[in-house]
Amino acid sequence: MSKPGVWFVGLFLLPIIVAFTALKLDWIPNETTNHGAFLEFELRQPELVLDTEWTIAFQRPQQCDEQCQTMLQSLPNLYTALGKNQHKVSLVVLQQPADAPIKNTQTVNLEIAKLKDNYLYLVDKTGLFVLEYAPSVKLDEAREVQKGLLKDIKKLLNYSRSS
């Protein structure tokens, strides 16, 4: 085999060997940097296609318990914490009765069986549910969950701006 042919084969095989070695020796990190959990199923709701890049949806149960009240009380603070990104993100409460409006939120009367009650969901501009955030009864823990959601949304907004 000629010298250029050896170089060609070597340059072709080297990345394959490095990739295979990286997989076998666990050089690739297993964890992700997001704070929410990826949904294990694909769920797309065209009703949630709004004029914003992202939507934060809260799945309100039929009977609003203490956990639900804590999450509902902290939603306006979450919207305020978005700061300059407020125009890029919508807040939506799913299954909210009409007699209890919340500042800066929209109401969508959807019953989605796959969604867990009291969870926050991050929905993209096509209506695809991407991440879920577990609820908390304690206000301090709810704030920590929302801080993680804010970090995720800011990262996503930054990435979408660069593409």
Pin down the residues of each PLM region.
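Hydrophobic membrane-insertion alpha-helices, especially the h-region
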Residues: S2-D26
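Short acidic, S/G/P-rich loop/turn micro-motifs used as interaction or catalytic elements
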Residues: P61-Q67, A98-D99, V137-K138
